[in-house]
Amino acid sequence: MTDSTAGFSTRAIHAGQPFEESTGAVIPPLHLSTTYHPYSIGELRGGYDYSRGTNPTRDSLQQQLAALEGGRFGISYASGLGAEDAVLRGLLKPGDHVVMGNDVYGGTFRLISRIHGAVGIGHTPVDLTDVDAVRAAVAETGAKLLWIETPSNPMMRIADVEALVAVAHEAGAYALVDNTFASPYLQQPLALGADLVVHSTTKYLGGHSDVVGGAVITNSEEIDSAVRFIQFAAGNQSSPFDAYLTTRGAKTLAVRMDRHCDNAEAVASWLLGRSEVSHVLYPGLDDHPGHDVAARQMRRFGGMVSVRLKGGEAAARKVAESTRVFTLAESLGGVESLMNYPSEMTHASVKGTELAVPEDLLRLSVGLEDAEDLLSDLERAFEGL
């Protein structure tokens, strides 16, 4: 079922997932074949010839992803950065420019600045919460692409998607939203006017920390054609097994995200009461600078919480290495809670640059465990300071 009037969970469960005609299997089979026998030369069965180009299991995922974001086209990749690379190669050429947040994910910054910068793609980091500053940067650089990440990783800043889309379109630029932190359940950038959405499906969409993947979703046939060509020609597609795991995980996205949000709200409230804490960065808090914008463009406020400690780097490192329920690890969005020290882990590539993450900051991916156990775990770690 891909009917856009169906509810979110109905689409998550049924889009791209018809029962299998020959046996009646309710779950479509995993198609591992690399190649397909045509009816005759030039007459393909269902459009399938070689699995790098098309694969039934990958097609199921791509239809599901499009349905969840309210888009016409979904394209799945081997990783989130692979999806981002396909966008940059498909839509830009040497001499073009990207305006992005000054707290963008470190991997995105590395990809744009070092890989694509080496072939003539320029970039300008700017505070995306300052719409006038973004407008000035887009105008001064003649940017072809405005890269919006909201909530941002790991500073949890909220960008006004509708306002920034308007800035991009006034200048004739594409507006892209990285929706990884929010997930399609909490935020629908295409409905807010974005031209395309990117995801690391490794995170909330897959949801179980057992599959790496990425995606691009758009309503534009032009964008789809350009970016899908990179998937095929560069061989950066998701494998059938990875697509299968991602599809299975995404079916429960709504119920998981509600639990992530419940637990994150409890953790953020608990952190507010701790004397060791200088700042709690969570858009669900009334005093968060982006709270009103987040309330307008998001269903709820997400499962990610960042916290800064008065004891600086030493305190942050000690807490990160002292928890038992929160696991010290990179990544996010799985059912288990993760503790991350971005300055030396996920954002080590931007250390010493204008995008450096504060050394007193911890990023918490709040999972689905019992909230009482999460709070007890944090209390044990904080009592050790």
Model-derived regions, located:
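PLP-dependent enzyme catalytic core of the Aspartate aminotransferase-like
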Residues: 113, 136-139, 321, 337-385
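Conserved small-domain helix->loop->beta segment predominantly found in fold-type I
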Residues: 265-324, 328-330, 349-356
